[in-house]
Amino acid sequence: MTLPEPAATVIKASGRTARPGVEGMSKHNDLLKELGYAAQSARTVDALMDTIVQRLHDTMTRYNWVGFYLIDKARPATLVLGPHVGSFEPHESISLDRGLCGAAATTKKTVVVNDVAKDPRYLRGSELVKSEMVVPVFSRAALFGEIDINSYFANTFTPEEQQFVEACAALVASYLEKPR
């Protein structure tokens, strides 16, 4: 069985391969392959995003809340909650000038905060959250939305974790850009 093209491209472009003794990398690669297959068979982008948040939440034990925030077509300066899973109620919408999600959207760069108590941009969703990562998702160079991950553990997000979630975002971008 061959790796689906979007996942193969993402893994190759990221330079990520499992190395002996690096269990996390292997777990990431296995999950990326699984999500690549999901991207090939998903009927809608919402179905793909649902699969991504569920699998990240189920597989990555320190990912306590995983969700997508999407650019609101009616209010382009606002992110609205998309597919999500986790143990607390998230913000329904976030202005692009607020929070870590707003920072990732306006800078168009991944934001990783391994101690949210030390970052004044953090918008509290739960007192239990200790670290957060927000990864932008682009479609044809325009911001489509972002993957937001909250953890109840400080220092959850390593550079490898960041690359992994950026690869998941690239799968969504690839899905959005494929001809229909």
How would you name each of these model-derived features?
Residues 138-151:
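Sensory-domain boundary capping and coupling elements
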